[in-house]
From Swiss-Prot:
It is found in: Membrane. This is C-type lectin domain family 10 member A. Residues 57-304 are extracellular. It is a single-pass type II membrane protein. Residues 1-35 are cytoplasmic. Residues 172-298 form the C-type lectin domain. Detected in lymph node in the subcapsular sinus, interfollicular regions, T and B-cell boundary and in the areas surrounding high endothelial venules (at protein level). Expressed on the surface of activated macrophages. Expressed in heart, lung, testis, skeletal muscle, spleen, brain, kidney and thymus. Expressed in P388, RAW 264.7 and M1 cell lines.
């Protein structure tokens, strides 16, 4: 179209008469050509700007796409690592479960063995209980027999004493007992707690010694020769009392200074509820479970 306009312009120039000025139509066409050129340049610039913007956005999109791909690759790697870790944990759990099953089976077998052992123990306890009861019966019979033998021995001892005195009937103490002022005394060579010593004397048809006077105290003190020995005095069941029922409050006393004190600082539990003769002679209260020597006493009796 531009070309046709130029051609038309040239034809008009040739047809114009010489010596005349260009017409107003020609000038208008020149101006139209300029506008068209400027429009084309503007349009080109606009297209260039659009292309630049699109190119810039495309570059940004490519960068964003690269970032997304990198993020996706990183996330994929992490997910793969997590899956591998989960697989490893699953294997460990399976091994742990297998081990637990083995342990449970072992414990089940041990429990069964324990039940069997418990039944055996119960059976053994029953057997031991029966044997213990039989032994107690035998021990009771044996104790009665020993006591009878002691009586027989005492009778023989007294009969021997009677023969030595030309048949005169005399009072006598059992063998290895010491006679003093109408009583027989037996001084132990071993040590026992107060309850065990009390039991021993009762089995001998006697009791732990009861000190009734200063004279008896001096006799015992001289015979003991500085040996600590239990006597038949206790307050385990209330106030102090003698084992043979002798009135303690009205009777002879020989406590050491500041005694009895019922001391709790010995660390053995409880107080001090049993009395003994000290090495110097005075009495002292002490823990009944301590072990000392002891003295048994019985009244002198005649045997026919």
């Amino acid at each position: 179209m531009i070309y046709e306009n130029l051609q038309n312009s040239r034809i008009e120039e040739k047809t114009q008469e010489p010596g005349k000025a260009p017409s107003q139509s020609f000038l208008w066409r020149i101006l139209s050509w300029t506008h068209l050129l400027l429009f084309s340049l503007g349009l080109s610039l606009l297209l260039l700007v659009v292309v630049s913007v699109i190119g810039s956005q495309n570059s940004q999109l490519r960068r964003d796409l690269g970032t997304l791909r990198a993020t996706l690759d990183n996330t994929t790697s992490k997910i793969k690592a997590e899956f591998q870790s989960l697989d490893s944990r699953a294997d460990s759990f399976e091994k742990g479960i297998s081990s637990l099953k083995v342990d449970v089976e072992d414990h089940r077998q041990e429990l069964q063995a324990g039940r069997d052992l418990s039944q055996k123990v119960t059976s053994l306890e029953s057997t031991v209980e029966k044997r213990e009861q039989a032994l107690k019966t035998d021990l009771s019979d044996l104790t009665d027999h020993v006591q009878q033998l002691r009586k027989d021995l005492k009778a023989l001892t007294c009969q021997l004493a009677n023969l030595k005195n030309n048949g005169s009937e005399v009072a006598c103490c059992p063998l290895h007992w010491t006679e003093h002022e109408g009583s027989c005394y037996w001084f132990s060579e071993s040590e026992k707690s107060w309850p065990e010593a009390d039991k021993y004397c009762r089995l001998e048809n006697s009791h732990l010694v009861v000190v009734n006077s200063l004279e008896e105290q001096n006799f015992l003190q001289n015979r003991l020769a500085n040996v600590v020995s239990w006597i038949g005095l206790t307050d385990q069941n209330g106030p102090w009392r003698w084992v043979d029922g002798t009135d303690f409050e009205k009777g002879f006393k020989n406590w050491a200074p500041l005694q009895p004190d019922n001391w709790f600082g010995h660390g053995l539990g409880g107080g001090e509820d049993c009395a003994h003769i000290t090495t110097g002679g005075p009495w002292n209260d002490d823990v009944c479970q301590r072990t000392f020597r002891w003295i048994c006493e019985m009244k002198l009796a005649k045997e026919s």
